[in-house]
């Protein structure tokens, strides 16, 4: 139906504009009405059109007219097709959608996967200086030492040249202390022979076996077993843990080899053929047989010869020193006995206090008389006997009689001075 109010030229213009919109391949009409202002044109950008089109001077600004809403917030997700404004693609929504989906998948997987309980290790922290458990490297000695904890105490197992040997020692001790289920460095099948051996030994005995398999003392400076450098500069040989003692001293030697040989001989005497030695035990057969034939020992004689490997000079020196010490001890005991006898004799002959002094009043019978007539004889007789005994003791101890007289006079001088100071004169001895 024609609208009579419109002009014919306006109707013709509207028809031309409509045909132009439908004829253009790169344009489509989103909505159409009689009013020209209500038409919305959406362009599908193409590469050819973008190259031929003259871009405006103003920069392009992209606005997101339909932001995505979370499903929990009650918003409605946009179901509209993706629009392309002047060839610009909106990829943010895709990234957001993909990331949210990935997060949801990860959360779901984390919820579905059950939490695995962590196995607590009973072995404690690993050593910082070694890859093996129970092994520590000491820079000062340059050796690998093995330790194990038992009842809150750290038990020393020995010092070794390699970390592998120290780890083996730790494994053996761990199996002995904690059983077959103990945490060890290597496979349990490697210790079948050790399992048979440790059944007949206690913990302490097995630890001693491990220590004997190590290379010497933990802080020793010698490569030989039972040998360490003494502070005097010589090499000391000793054997530890023997018959309840901490260690048995074997002597000082000029070289390490001599000290090592002394240790080997002592070990063979104590442990027999099973002893762990530094050298081949067969080289000591002749010496040990000669000693056993010349000086037969009984099983009860466990005392070792302390001068086992010393040289002849040092042996004679030690014997001379022992003789001198014994002689000095005997002399000192003899002199002490003599002095004790002399003191008891002097105490038994003390003067009687009932005698009167000259010039005093007469008490009892008679007047004044000489001071201590009878007691002085006994006292001087005791002094003479004591002097003679002391002279003999001084002669036996190596002192000259003249030297002894000087000592005796010096000891008797204070008594005489006291008598003279107080006005008393020593009594005159009656001629016999």
Swiss-Prot record:
Belongs to the AP2/ERF transcription factor family. AP2 subfamily. The lineage of its organism: Eukaryota, Viridiplantae, Streptophyta, Embryophyta, Tracheophyta. A motif (EAR) lies at residues 304-308. May form homodimer. Interacts with HDA19 and with TPL in an EAR-motif dependent manner. Residues 131-187, 223-280 bind DNA. Changing residue 420 to E: In AP2-5; temperature-sensitive. This is Floral homeotic protein APETALA 2. Keywords: Activator, Developmental protein, Differentiation, DNA-binding, Flowering, Nucleus, Repeat, Transcription, Transcription regulation. Changing residue 251 to S: In AP2-1; temperature-sensitive. Probable transcriptional activator that promotes early floral meristem identity. Is required subsequently for the transition of an inflorescence meristem into a floral meristem. Plays a central role in the specification of floral identity, particularly for the normal development of sepals and petals in the wild-type flower, by spatially controlling the expression domains of multiple floral organ identity genes. Acts as A class cadastral protein by repressing the C class floral homeotic gene AGAMOUS in association with other repressors like LEUNIG and SEUSS. The keyword Transcription regulation applies. GO terms for cellular component: nucleus. The keyword Nucleotidyltransferase does not apply. Sepals, petals, stamens, carpels, developing ovules, inflorescence stem, leaf and stem. The gene is AP2. CDD domains: AP2.
């Amino acid at each position: 139906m024609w609208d009579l109010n419109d002009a014919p030229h306006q109707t013709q213009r509207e028809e031309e504009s409509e045909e132009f919109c439908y004829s253009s391949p790169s344009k489509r009409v989103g909505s159409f009405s009689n009013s020209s202002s209500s038409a919305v044109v959406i362009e599908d950008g193409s590469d050819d059109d973008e190259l031929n089109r003259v871009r405006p001077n103003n920069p392009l600004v992209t606005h997101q007219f339909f932001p995505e809403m979370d499903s929990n917030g009650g918003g409605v997700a946009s179901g509209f097709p993706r629009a392309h404004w002047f060839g610009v693609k909106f990829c943010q929504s895709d990234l957001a959608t993909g990331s949210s989906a990935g997060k949801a998948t990860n959360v779901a997987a984390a919820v579905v996967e059950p939490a695995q309980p962590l196995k607590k290790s009973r072995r404690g922290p690993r050593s910082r200086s070694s890859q093996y458990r129970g092994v520590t490297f000491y820079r000062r000695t340059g050796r690998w030492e093995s330790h194990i904890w038992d009842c809150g105490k750290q038990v020393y197992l020995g010092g070794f040249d390699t970390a592998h040997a120290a780890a083996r020692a730790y494994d053996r001790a761990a199996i002995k202390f904690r059983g077959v289920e103990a945490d060890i460095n290597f496979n349990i099948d490697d210790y079948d022979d050790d399992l048979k051996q440790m059944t007949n030994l206690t913990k302490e005995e097995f630890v001693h076996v491990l220590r004997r398999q190590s290379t010497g003392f933990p802080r020793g400076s010698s490569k030989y077993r039972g040998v360490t450098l003494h502070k005097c500069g010589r090499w000391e040989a000793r054997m530890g843990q023997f018959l309840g003692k901490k260690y048995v001293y074997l002597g000082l030697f000029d070289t390490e080899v001599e000290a090592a040989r002394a240790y080997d001989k002592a070990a063979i005497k104590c442990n027999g053929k099973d002893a762990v030695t530094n050298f081949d035990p067969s080289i000591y057969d002749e010496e040990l047989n000669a000693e056993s034939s010349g000086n037969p020992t009984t099983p009860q004689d466990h005392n070792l010869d302390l001068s086992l490997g010393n040289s002849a000079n040092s042996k004679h020196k030690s014997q001379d020193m022992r003789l001198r010490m014994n002689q000095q001890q005997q002399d000192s005991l003899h002199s002490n006995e003599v002095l004790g006898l002399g003191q008891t004799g002097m105490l038994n002959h003390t003067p009687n206090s009932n005698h009167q002094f000259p010039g005093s009043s007469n008490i009892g019978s008679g007047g004044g008389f000489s001071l201590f007539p009878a007691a002085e004889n006994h006292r001087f007789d005791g002094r003479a006997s004591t002097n003679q005994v002391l002279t003999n003791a001084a002669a036996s101890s190596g002192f000259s009689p003249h030297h002894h007289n000087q000592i005796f006079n010096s000891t008797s001088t204070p008594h005489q001075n006291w008598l003279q100071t107080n006005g008393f004169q020593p009594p005159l001895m009656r001629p016999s």
